[in-house]
């Protein structure tokens, strides 16, 4: 089953758009988890098992694993394996934000889509279309291009306007994506940009948006849901998995995910 089918089936079944991010920042892990031989695997498994009833997708962030070198990569692969073996119906978005020359990009695509078999990943568009094409060859998978991100300094580049076209950089990213038009290319649009999100959604009614920045970064569901549309994944990471740093961290993650799920479910029919 391709990414779009898995996403739509899961989203419509749960009547939700919740993507649970997995950012296992070691410094913030509960002490009992830090004593585990594989703390990142232990923590992520607990969070996954606690939130699976409410997750439309999971988004593990590679940076929190890479910091531990080869051990971290092995733990990342085990987390992916846990998801694929136990929750094959839930799509995986590998948050890697790569962007490199086509020959290098081909190696990334082979590892993440070929070997790990993640359903989707995030890429930077900065180096152009030739860095994207090796990923699009895996037609059952989906690529999320960074379009307009939620960090405050994104305006230094992403909202600058091209004199030749009158479009901003983020608008240019969307324009180029539409010029090649495959629907296995989606956009990352930060939750803190609700005005631009609404415009992008009207221009791209059928593209899937990955929307980070909800929860810990301050964006609110009441602002997002009226403008994002059903073809969206609204991500919450820290707000769910670091709801508690005590022994009840998994139970609290379950409660936070359920709370978001219920809020989305109540509004889903209006999306």
UniProtKB/Swiss-Prot annotation:
Listed CDD domains: OMP_decarboxylase_like (cd04725)
- Tell me where on the tree of life, at the top rank, the source sits: Bacteria
The record's InterPro entries line, in alphabetical order, gives: Aldolase_TIM (IPR013785), OMPdecase_type-2 (IPR011995), OMPdeCOase_dom (IPR001754), RibuloseP-bd_barrel (IPR011060)
- Keyword Lipid biosynthesis assigned to the entry: answer is no
List the NCBIfam families. pyrF_sub2 (TIGR02127)
Can you tell me which family this protein belongs to? Answer: Belongs to the OMP decarboxylase family. Type 2 subfamily.
Protein name (record): Orotidine 5'-phosphate decarboxylase
Q: What lineage does UniProt assign to this protein's organism?
A: Bacteria, Pseudomonadati, Spirochaetota, Spirochaetia, Leptospirales
């Amino acid at each position: 089953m391709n990414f779009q089918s898995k996403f739509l089936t899961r989203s419509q079944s749960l009547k939700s758009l919740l993507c649970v991010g997995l950012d296992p920042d070691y410094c913030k892990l509960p002490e009992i988890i830090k004593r585990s031989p594989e703390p990142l695997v232990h923590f992520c498994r607990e969070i996954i098992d606690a939130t699976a009833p409410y997750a439309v997708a999971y988004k593990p962030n590679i940076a929190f694993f890479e910091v531990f070198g080869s051990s971290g990569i092995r733990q990342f692969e085990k987390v992916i394996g846990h998801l694929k073996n136990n929750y094959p119906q839930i799509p995986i978005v590998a948050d890697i934000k790569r962007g490199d020359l086509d020959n290098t990009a081909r190696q990334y695509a082979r590892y993440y889509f070929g070997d790990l078999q993640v359903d989707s990943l995030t890429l930077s568009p900065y180096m152009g279309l030739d860095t994207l094409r090796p990923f699009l060859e895996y037609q059952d998978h989906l690529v999320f291009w960074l379009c307009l991100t939620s960090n405050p300094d994104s305006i230094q580049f992403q909202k600058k306007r091209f004199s030749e076209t009158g479009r901003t950089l983020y608008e240019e990213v969307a324009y180029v994506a539409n010029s090649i038009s495959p629907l296995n290319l989606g956009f990352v649009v930060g939750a803190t940009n609700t005005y631009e999100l609404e415009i992008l959604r009207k221009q791209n009614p059928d593209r899937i948006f990955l929307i980070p920045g909800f929860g810990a970064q301050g964006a609110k569901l009441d602002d997002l849901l009226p403008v994002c549309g059903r073809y969206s994944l609204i991500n919450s990471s820290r707000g769910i998995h670091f709801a508690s740093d005590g022994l009840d961290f998994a139970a609290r993650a379950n409660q936070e995910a359920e709370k978001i799920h219920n809020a989305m479910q109540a509004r889903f029919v209006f999306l």
